[in-house]
Swiss-Prot record:
Descriptive protein name: Probable tRNA sulfurtransferase
HAMAP family: ThiI (MF_00021)
Pathway where this protein functions: Cofactor biosynthesis; thiamine diphosphate biosynthesis
Molecular function terms from GO: ATP binding; CCA tRNA nucleotidyltransferase activity; tRNA binding; tRNA-uracil-4 sulfurtransferase activity
Name of the gene encoding the protein in the UniProt record: thiI
Subcellular location(s) of the protein: Cytoplasm
Binding-site residues for ATP, renumbered to this chain: M183, L184, H208, F209, R265, G287, Q296
Domain of life: Bacteria
Reactions it catalyzes: [ThiI sulfur-carrier protein]-S-sulfanyl-L-cysteine + a uridine in tRNA + 2 reduced [2Fe-2S]-[ferredoxin] + ATP + H(+) = [ThiI sulfur-carrier protein]-L-cysteine + a 4-thiouridine in tRNA + 2 oxidized [2Fe-2S]-[ferredoxin] + AMP + diphosphate; [ThiS sulfur-carrier protein]-C-terminal Gly-Gly-AMP + S-sulfanyl-L-cysteinyl-[cysteine desulfurase] + AH2 = [ThiS sulfur-carrier protein]-C-terminal-Gly-aminoethanethioate + L-cysteinyl-[cysteine desulfurase] + A + AMP + 2 H(+)
Entries under Pfam families matching the protein: ThiI, ThiI_fer, THUMP
Domain THUMP: residue ranges: 61-165
Lineage: Bacteria, Bacillati, Bacillota, Bacilli, Bacillales
Length: 407
């Protein structure tokens, strides 16, 4: 079947009132960015639907795949746009039926947005079903459990006919909900947390704490790859890599061993808080899950959060670990997340970290050293990378450069 349009159904933005135009415009911009590099199509965003007009050479499968990854889209259907005459509709219905297997069953489903159309729903079903039955002897109707369902939408401008409905990613268009800073560790949880807030229309930049030589270049490349996977959904993402060795060593030098994890997290939050103000973000996002590890109890969260007045969003707070793993596999980050390269949160983990840290104690331990200068130095020396969906890892870039230099 050669389709001439893609019908794109909106997600939650259909619930928006006077702001709907803003959401539709943002979604159209996101669609155009996602389809960059492809040709043979024209995007037409309307208030209630988006239509993508296809030329003969358009790669409909690739376009549909990319659309399915965009937040704000509920579903996509390859459609035939048909004139509002029974003759044109019957001819299109026969085209669909030509693709059916022998002895298969079908039904006609009609939705009339144009209530002034000359035929009602039942009449259309009868006429189109009758046209198919007259043309084929080995096809029958089954309205309860059909093998095929031809869907017909009667709209003001034309008739749209289709069979397939491809699920989209739902949510709201990225860019409509403000900017956040994602604390990206390299584990399973934080990429999922980033994906969850992006699904609510939020733009993200990511921050990662790197402690060489205790953490390897492979750990850094792992985080770059996780960012690249997230960028497949939303376009380029800035990744801020913080040189954290000096701060982490000092924490382990002056803070009681049971409190080093709490204090380390507080230092991370202080660095993140400064970066939030630099980039104009409105919140910090992390993958914390209540009670999962020692640093994620309510007592720990209270002690850690105390260093910032910036809102901290925890979209995975109440998830079961198995739920997070399932989502990680769905979004394509799981296999990268489980690569055995340690991050700075795991290399200095104490044997018996405190699970209910006393806030006054952690402040007392940190008071023996003025960390502010180190924190400012870490922020000043941040390495910022813009990660795109086709971003090559540092190792690949270096290898290519060496090859080019050699040649």
């Amino acid at each position: 079947m050669k389709y001439d349009h893609l019908l794109v159904r909106y997600g939650e933005l259909t619930l928006k009132g006077s702001n709907r135009k803003k959401f539709v415009n943002q979604l159209r911009n996101n669609v155009n960015k996602s389809l960059k590099g492809l040709d043979g199509f024209v995007v037409k965003g309307k208030r209630d639907r988006m239509y993508i007009e296809l030329e003969d050479h358009a790669d409909i499968n690739e376009i549909t795949y990319r659309l399915s990854k965009i937040f704000g889209i509920k579903s996509i259907s390859p459609v035939l746009k048909v004139e509002k005459t029974i003759e044109a509709m019957s001819a299109a219905a026969i085209k669909f039926a030509q693709q059916f297997e022998e002895n298969s069953t079908f039904k006609i489903d009609v939705k009339r947005a144009d209530k002034n159309f000359s035929m009602d729903t039942y009449e259309l079903q009868r006429e189109l079903g009758g046209a198919i039955l007259k043309h084929f002897d080995n096809i029958s109707v089954n309205v309860k459990r059909p093998d095929h369902e031809i869907r017909v939408e009667v709209r003001l401008d034309a008739i749209y006919m289709y069979e397939e409905v491809v699920p989209g990613s739902g949510g709201l268009p990225v860019g409509t909900g403000g900017k956040t800073l994602l604390m990206l560790s390299g584990g399973i949880d934080s990429p999922v947390a980033g994906m969850e807030v992006m699904r609510r229309g939020v733009t993200i930049e990511a921050i990662h704490f790197h402690s060489p030589p205790f953490t390897s270049d492979q750990a850094k490349e792992k985080v770059i790859e996780l960012t690249r996977i997230l960028a497949e959904r939303v376009g380029p993402i800035k990744l801020h890599i913080v040189p954290f060795t000096e701060l982490q060593k000092q924490v382990n030098k002056v803070v009681h061993p049971r409190y080093t994890m709490t204090s380390t997290r507080r230092m991370m939050m202080r660095v993140a808080d400064k970066l939030v103000h630099q980039i104009g973000a409105l919140a910090i996002v992390n993958g914390e899950n209540l009670g999962q590890v020692a640093s994620q109890t309510l007592h720990s969260m209270y002690a850690i959060n105390n260093v910032t007045s910036t809102p901290v969003l925890r979209p995975l707070l109440t998830y079961d670990k198995e739920e997070i793993i399932i989502k990680s596999k769905e979004i394509g980050t799981f296999e990268t997340s489980i690569q055995p390269f340690e991050d700075c949160c795991t290399i200095f983990t104490p044997k018996n970290p405190v699970t209910e840290p006393n806030f006054d104690k952690v402040v007392q331990y940190e008071s023996v050293f003025d960390f502010e200068e180190m924190i400012n130095r870490a922020v000043e020396n941040i390495e910022t990378l813009e990660i795109t969906s086709d971003y090559k890892t540092i190792k690949e870039q270096q290898t290519n450069q060496l090859i080019n230099d050699f040649l």
